[in-house]
């Protein structure tokens, strides 16, 4: 099998397509959550903490000299990323928990008892007839 045919077979499998759709939706969801955190959650937290903007927090290791930019540890961006991750992970957890709850409810639905086969019905009739004969 040629390399191109193998790739077509791989790419056309359902799992790969499902994974690609999941990655695209996940990336879009990540942008939504990042915007939610940066634009909705962080401003009130910044006010509570005295007007601190986490993105601006950094430690200057070496000041800018001439054309060379300053060397900084931008720990504020790291804090922002950790908060984004925590909220995304929590949202995914809640979504999966809801899906699992729905699946459990579907599984717990009582199943109708199986109908007896013709052989079982005949055996039941024979049993009933034998019991009736013994009682006489």
Swiss-Prot record:
Molecular function as annotated in GO: mechanosensitive monoatomic ion channel activity
This protein's UniProt keywords: Cell inner membrane, Cell membrane, Ion channel, Ion transport, Membrane, Transmembrane, Transmembrane helix, Transport
GO cellular component: plasma membrane
Membrane-spanning parts: 9-29, 79-99
Matches recorded under Pfam families: MscL
Topology term for the membrane: Multi-pass membrane protein
The organism's place on the tree of life at top rank: Bacteria
Localization terms from the record: Cell inner membrane
Family: Belongs to the MscL family.
Role played: Channel that opens in response to stretch forces in the membrane lipid bilayer. May participate in the regulation of osmotic pressure changes within the cell.
Quaternary structure note: Homopentamer.
NCBIfam families, per the entry: mscL, PRK00567.1-4
Protein name (database record): Large-conductance mechanosensitive channel
Organism whose genome encodes this protein: Shewanella sp. (strain W3-18-1)
